[in-house]
Amino acid sequence: MLKSPLFWKMTSLFGAVLLLLIPIMLIRQVIVERADYRSDVEDAIRQSTSGPQKLVGPLIAIPVTELYTVQEEDKTVERKRSFIHFWLPESLMVDGNQNVEERKIGIYTGQVWHSDLTLKADFDVSRLSELNAPNITLGKPFIVISVGDARGIGVVKAPEVNGTALTIEPGTGLEQGGQGVHIPLPEGDWRKQNLKLNMALNLSGTGDLSVVPGGRNSEMTLTSNWPHPSFLGDFLPAKREVSESGFQAHWQSSWFANNLGERFASGNDTGWENFPAFSVAVTTPADQYQLTDRATKYAILLIALTFMAFFVFETLTAQRLHPMQYLLVGLSLVMFYLLLLALSEHTGFTVAWIIASLIGAIMNGIYLQAVLKGWCNSMLFTLALLLLDGVMWGLLNSADSALLLGTSVLVVALAGMMFVTRNIDWYAFSLPKMKASKEVTTDDELRIWK
């Protein structure tokens, strides 16, 4: 077997494929590095503007001082404790209009969104009946609105409670801190009537916009000009419409679904970043780095199909190709991915794919004209390479049926190879070539006499 030309041919082709894995891995490393550079740009934009935003509120914080007694050494001792009671709204309505703009640093872009939010909350005074005990003293209440990054708070219109304009102050007003704003309620017996709050604020950020549905019944409607939303969080929108011009989504929830009534009743717990929320993220669709990385996963398939076509050509014709010629064609296929990555950063992925495919086809067409001794075979292989590039493009753009399409390509390629080689005597290729035997001489030819 070691003397078989077919064995050494297959071994050399397998070795060429293994060698080509090295530049493929290097290109994938370059893709990771370029994607990291893009992530650094997004971080820089986030640091210079504001980060993801999580809106909690409006809710009313009521300082409570409670006197209670305990038994110590056969005597009654009076104790005092202070805590914050959160008065949650019966209904919370959030209506927002979001505008997304792109910020560019070098060749990289990131997104910053600006949302104009209108908040309407109704508070039922009957929820405060538990605070009417004689041993309880109430402090001055204030409305709390918490956000993820206070740098994103823009214009805030004067909020109104029961038609009365109030003053808004920075910070949440809570001892535990937190970023946001608070609105002191006016003096008076506010416990004798229901409260209706109306306010509007401009909130900017990057990445996620989340709103905690703190009302007994909560709804949110958001309209945006960004066509690539990613709906996250604990609640998917009840309704949503996504088009090339943007999206509109509507969420709704209640305490029966999120249990926020009990979680806020825990008092001084302000770990609100873990509370369930309506969420949507402004995300970049599958960018050039993700697409190029996916494309490189099919590189071995492209190289294997090309080598298989060359091998069948050798088998059916008298033309012989050296393993170095296989390797050079394979390198040109690998360079396609590096060229695709470099071009896609400037022209977009689709245009880069077309240009890289044409450049690769021209390179191989000119080279194969000399290798295959003619333009006819060269053009045939060049068109086949362009067809394979088209198949790879189809695989990238059919995520749901990529497995089916890829399997179909392999089945068709294998069936084609089986068909064109069905009459080949492989044993003839496997046998080592025998040296031509010398002519047999007769005794009469060796004689020096007659």
UniProtKB/Swiss-Prot annotation:
Side Periplasmic, residues: 28-297, 344-347, 400
UniProt entry keywords in alphabetical sequence: Cell inner membrane, Cell membrane, Membrane, Transmembrane, Transmembrane helix
InterPro entries given in the database record: Uncharacterised_IM_CreD
Localization in the cell: Cell inner membrane
Transmembrane segments: 7-27, 298-318, 323-343, 348-368, 379-399, 401-421
Membrane protein topology class: Multi-pass membrane protein
Cystine pairings recorded for this chain: none
Pfam families listed in its UniProt record: CreD
GO cellular component, one term: plasma membrane
Coiled-coil stretches noted in the UniProt entry, renumbered to this chain: none
Keyword Cell membrane set for record: yes
PANTHER family: INNER MEMBRANE PROTEIN CRED
Leftover remarks: Mutations of this gene leads to an enhanced transcription of the gene cause tolerance to colicin E2.
Official protein name in the record: Inner membrane protein CreD
Organism (species): Escherichia coli (strain K12)
